[in-house]
């Protein structure tokens, strides 16, 4: 499940240099008063095991659902965004984030985790989820993040899991998988 909407909004437009602070503030942000939709609540309440990223927006999403994680692990945290100096531009953080993520996906990572390393982490995360699913009597819920959730989903499919339900990829949305 993708976490709820973070409370942090920050400035409407920032320079590329200011994006480092914006990203740090975003990573420290919880979900504030964001309320999960009923569909997310019912999915989450059906879970017999709950795993989570350690980032505040994931943990506060579980709190909004009145749930506690069984496991909190760095392996589930979002892939960091690199920041590239591009003087003279003031853009919305969303535009910068898309640009920086595309650069990252192209293998240009500067001083953050490389895409290949994140993919290896996704393999590890999928292995953890698969192990919990095999041991569990019910559903396993991961409260995670957009990019890492997609990378983990790819690895779950490679392990023989099949997606049988997808709400989308936005806040509070989830995809469900079964081992075939």
Descriptions of predicted regions:
Residues 44-45, 129-138:
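Glycine-rich phosphate-binding loop signature in dinucleotide/nucleotide-binding domains
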Residues 17, 157-180:
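Domain-level recognition of soluble alpha/beta enzyme cores
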Residues 1-76, 94-124, 172, 180:
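Active-site-proximal alpha-helix that buttresses catalytic centers in soluble enzyme cores
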Residues 64, 68, 132, 155-159:
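Active-site catalytic microenvironments for nucleophilic, acid-base chemistry
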Residues 58-60, 149-152:
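Short, well-ordered alpha-helical microsegments
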Residues 75-90:
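Signature for phosphate-centric chemistry
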Residues 1-2, 51, 138-148:
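Beta-strand elements within well-structured catalytic alpha/beta cores of enzymes
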Residues 8, 79-80, 148:
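Feature marks short, surface-exposed loop/turn motifs that line or immediately flank catalytic pockets
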């Amino acid at each position: 499940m993708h976490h709820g909407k973070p409370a942090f909004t920050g400035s409407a437009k920032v320079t590329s240099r200011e994006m480092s602070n914006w990203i740090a503030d975003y990573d420290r942000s919880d979900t504030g008063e964001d309320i999960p939709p009923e569909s997310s609540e019912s999915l989450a309440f059906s879970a017999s095991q709950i795993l989570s990223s350690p980032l505040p927006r994931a943990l506060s999403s579980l709190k909004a659902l009145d749930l506690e994680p069984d496991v909190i692990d760095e392996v589930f945290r979002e892939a960091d965004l690199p920041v590239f100096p591009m003087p003279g531009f003031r853009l919305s953080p969303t535009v910068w984030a898309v640009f920086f993520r595309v650069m990252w996906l192209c293998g240009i990572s500067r001083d953050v985790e490389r895409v290949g390393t994140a993919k290896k982490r996704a393999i590890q995360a999928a292995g953890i989820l698969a192990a919990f699913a095999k041991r569990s009597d019910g559903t396993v819920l991961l409260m995670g993040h957009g990019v890492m959730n997609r990378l983990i989903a790819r690895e779950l499919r490679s392990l023989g899991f099949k997606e049988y339900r997808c709400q989308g990829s936005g806040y509070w949305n989830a995809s469900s998988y079964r081992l075939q």
